[in-house]
Curated annotation (Swiss-Prot):
Known function: Catalyzes the NAD-dependent reduction of succinylglutamate semialdehyde into succinylglutamate.
Lineage: Bacteria, Pseudomonadati, Pseudomonadota, Gammaproteobacteria, Enterobacterales
EC number(s) stated in the UniProt entry for this protein: 1.2.1.71
SUPFAM superfamilies: ALDH-like
GO biological process: arginine catabolic process to glutamate; arginine catabolic process to succinate
Record CDD domains: ALDH_SGSD_AstD
Annotated family: Belongs to the aldehyde dehydrogenase family. AstD subfamily.
One Pfam family of this chain: Aldedh
Name of the protein this chain belongs to: N-succinylglutamate 5-semialdehyde dehydrogenase
Pathway(s) of this molecule: Amino-acid degradation; L-arginine degradation via AST pathway; L-glutamate and succinate from L-arginine: step 4/5
Annotated source species: Salmonella paratyphi A (strain AKU_12601)
Annotated active site: 243, 277
Binding site for NAD(+): 220-225
Length: 492
């Protein structure tokens, strides 16, 4: 029984599915997808639960969310292992994901009050009050790269605001989704407030096409995000929050400290085996002998990165990709760029056939035409050389995406120029592109999405503002508008 609908665990009636470890092929989870009728049933349960949940005092909703946080802390080691085994990422990184889930809850509670709480302004004859109300029934689509942390950012904020939810994890991480939902169950969520439907494309399409849905919160690829946007077009009454991918540029202008610049580049491009939406995909380096030394050192250090199993001891910096198919896709993208005329600086290599273990690849594309503007979700870094900083910014903006952008430079003026001219939601200076804070907005523009799914800014799309002018009594104004005559006529 792998679906949780209206407080009950039930068996899916859709396609049979199993999840294996992407390196060892060990079977981790087996179950059936939700079919269209079960997806509709989950929505009906959420709709029925909404009025009572929305009317709960905020303190009651907060208490359940805080109990969930305590359960995350108590089961941190278990959830860490589930995430690591299912995604293939090293244990150390899976542990940081669970920590981020825990920390995000306190921040989300503060964000609710700061961004969507109640604000009152006194007027001469009453008050003006701003309140926020939940949308209703929302769908949450989770990604596979951070299957606990990223859906958590949507779910916690939406529940605090008083919404009820249907959660569909990625079909590549059903075990993590189920494990997290079981903690919510133990936290005491009332039946129907949060529902779990497992499945792939068919389940997702059934969920996003429901008429009774008030909105959809999505983290994932641009292609799926665009499909959802088209599906919900012409329905302005539904909230649609999209956090999608990026073809992110990292500009290396000044490499006086070569090892520091190499470390920042490795963290930007290859952490999580390149499976972060903010990862650097394009490395823009200034022409000259200094950058030649930097690239040589980058190739040297990156060439020593050996992806390992989730439980290797000592632990590796990167693990496997989400699947052997994902690793193959990265290899094909590298070969495609070679065929276009790219010069390989570091060749990607499969550590073992049939697994998702893939070493990083670096390829130079200076002067190469017709390079696809796409997000290759894995450890592949494309290099371009530029002559001057204005050209670097032009290259950085030469993408339909607009998620993250970074600059390595000692010149503050260059960073100020980048802030003015970069088309990206995240612009970092001498910091990895993959660095983010839950108290800051996370997201981008263009093909990278619209709203900002972080703990702080998620509050914005989980509730709508209601403005009120209020007075405890009704009185006639002392001064009337022109043309109004309230004088009393004497009876004849």
């Amino acid at each position: 029984m792998t679906l949780w609908i209206n407080g009950d665990w039930i068996t899916g009636q859709g396609e049979r599915r199993r999840k294996t470890n992407p390196v060892s092929a060990e079977i981790l989870w087996q179950g059936n997808d939700a079919n269209a009728a079960q997806v509709a049933e989950a929505c009906q349960a959420a709709r029925a639960a909404f009025p009572r949940w929305a009317r709960q005092p905020f303190t009651a909703r907060q208490a359940i969310v805080q109990k969930f946080a305590a359960l995350l802390e108590a089961h941190k080691a278990d959830l860490t292992e589930v995430i690591a085994r299912e995604t293939g990422k090293p244990r150390w990184e899976a542990a940081t994901e669970v920590t981020a889930m825990i920390n995000k809850i306190a921040i989300s509670i503060k964000a609710y009050h700061a961004r969507t709480g109640e604000q009152k302004s006194e007027l001469v004859d009453g008050a003006a009050t701003l309140r926020h109300r939940p949308h209703g029934v929302l769908a949450v689509f989770g990604p596979y790269n951070f299957p606990g942390h990223l859906p958590n950012g949507h779910i916690v904020s939406a529940l605090l605001a008083g919404n009820t939810l249907i959660f569909k994890p990625s079909e590549l991480t059903p075990w993590t989704g189920e494990t997290v939902i079981k903690l919510w169950e133990r936290a005491g969520l009332p039946a129907g407030v949060l529902n779990l439907v497992q499945g792939g494309r068919e389940t997702g399409q059934a969920l996003s096409s429901l008429d009774d849905l008030d909105g959809l919160l999505f983290t994932g690829s641009a292609s799926t995000g665009y499909q959802l946007h088209r599906q919900l077009s012409g329905q302005p009454e539904k909230i649609l929050a999209l956090e999608m991918g990026g073809n992110n540029p990292l500009i290396i202008e000044d490499v006086a400290n070569i090892d520091a610049a190499v470390h920042l580049t490795l963290q930007s491009a290859f952490i999580t085996a390149g499976q972060r939406c903010t990862c650097a995909r394009r490395l823009l380096v200034k022409q000259g002998a200094q950058v030649d030394a930097f690239l040589a050192r980058l190739v040297d250090v990156a060439g020593r990165l050996q992806p390992g199993r989730w439980d290797d001891d000592p632990q590796s910096f990167i693990g496997g990709l989400i699947s052997a198919q994902a690793a193959q896709h990265v290899m094909e993208a590298w070969r495609q760029r070679e065929a276009l005329g790219g010069r390989t600086l570091l060749a990607s290599r499969k550590v073992k056939e049939g697994t998702s273990l893939l070493t990083p690849g670096i390829i130079e594309l200076t002067g190469v035409a017709d390079v696809p503007d796409e997000e290759v979700f894995g450890p592949l870094l494309n290099v371009w050389r530029y002559a001057h900083f204005d050209e670097a910014i032009r290259l950085a903006n030469n993408t339909r995406f607009g998620l993250s952008c970074g600059l390595v430079s000692t010149d503050r003026a260059q960073f100020e120029q980048l802030l003015l001219e970069a088309r990206a939601g995240i612009v970092n200076w001498n910091k990895p592109l993959t660095g983010a804070a839950s108290t800051a907005p996370f997201g981008g523009v263009g093909a990278s999405g619209n709203h900002r799914p972080s703990a702080w800014y998620a509050a914005d799309y989980c509730a709508w503002p209601m403005a009120s002018l209020e007075s405890p009594e009704l009185t006639l104004p002392a001064t009337l508008s022109p043309g109004l005559d309230f004088s009393r006529r004497e009876a004849v």
